[in-house]
Amino acid sequence: DDALSVESRGRNLRIGVHISDVAAWVEKGGAIDQEALARGTSIYMPDRKIPMLPTGLAEGLCSLVRGEVRPAVSIFFTATPQADILDWEITPSVVSVKRQLNYSEADSLAESDKSLRALAAAAGTFNRRRLENGAVQILLPDLSVRVYNGGDIQVKIMDRDSPARLLVSEMMIMANWVMARFLAQKNMPAVFRSQLHPRGRLYSGQDEGTLFQNWMQRRMLSRAILGTGPEYHSGLGLDAY
């Protein structure tokens, strides 16, 4: 689980990305840790969810719930209006979420809420910089399928381009970029993710391309590479990830 914070620092923004510290609740090598290792990930299906961690942890103690104090790992960075990162700090923290919004609620407040407006502006600028640096933007329909107890099936097309979804996506990408640069700078052992250039480009930059072009562009992407050092990630347009 994760949360965002933002403060004004003159013309710049002090942005915080706070990630729930699961290790504070799960003992290394303990029964829960071993079972989570065996499962590897949570599985989401139209009619059920198989969690990696027990529900009481995943949706309780390990979740950043409004009004509850939770241990976390926080990534703070100062960003200019041009999305340049001036400094960063990664630190253990204790957080209490003030507002818990879903995407629809965040979208409805995107224009009127000062904090959301500031985060959205930073996210948009960072997105444009990534595209200018060669990032590949794949925009395909995102379907949500749910099967209810009575057998009814609900299919929804999610708006992947909504302001709130773009905000969260870009903040997570920015936080991972900052973390990768921090780990590389400190020469700390880590697993980095990179990607070679695609085999071809059907569209570029701010051009979103047609639905067919997006499907074909995805087929032209190179495989992601996991390594022990930072390398260029062409899909994201970043020098480290």
Task: Locate predicted features.
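Electropositive polyanion-binding surfaces
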Residues: D1-Y241
